[in-house]
Amino acid sequence: MEQKSPNNFLELGENAVELLKNLISIPSFSKEEDKTADLIEKYLQEKGVKTHREKNNIWAFNHNFSPEKPTILLNSHHDTVRPNSGYTLDPFTPIVKDGKLFGLGSNDAGGALVSLMAAFLYFYNAKDLKYNFIYAATAEEENSGLDGVESVLPHFGNLEFAIVGEPTEMQMAIAEKGLMVVDCEASGTSSHAAHFNDDNAIYNALKDIEWIKNYQFPNTSEVLGDVKMTVTVINAGKLHNMVPNTCTFTIDVRTTDQYSNREVLQIIRENIKSKAEARSFRLNSSSIPLDH
């Protein structure tokens, strides 16, 4: 196969910016990234790169990959969250202003995605490298989905280390907090709003929410700081004149290396009256040694 990958910095940079503009213009919400996966796959193939695909994950090995050498993974994601109501620009129209490229996913994590691809293409045809390179543009990062990087890691073999592109203000990150989503339900007694009722499920939920807001976990991580709990969703009632007997709310919990997700859930249950159930314990905090 003819090798077409560019090998000069200027061309790589210009191509990366154009690719990022094209990615921004295509909606790629988590689990709906098929069109950006198509674009990335086609782009690499046009550069002479043999690609592999599983669902919306695209990856490639450098041309002279050798099983005898250690391997570096270059990884970032091409899915995005949905734009919020505060957007002042069209999220799908890439705009260059004051030397910056604006658009949904330009920073998280399109910039890193195309930069790592440029680095991969630069070394793609190189001979006598000390390391192999694998480039992986993966899906479902924003929703911590099961069909993202976790699902394709077995295809990569043993890795010496990975460079994962995320917007960290160009600071090396060696640890990340875990994530646990907890669904809670406060109970009360239903009645007409005109009647006296001191067992309003909403008020009962608010007492628990106040504890969640103010509680400080005793142990603080040297690298990750404190466990953070934030109530992000609350629902109750359907009629203005009826006191609801249930109030549900959701807690976004960011855990550290000081507590497992299961330990945090146990602490929550011991301190609130609402029922509390974790959607998953899968995403505990992770880190590598400070002197790595």
Where are these regions (language model features)?
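Metal-dependent amide/peptide-bond hydrolase catalytic core
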Residues: 4, 11, 174, 183-292
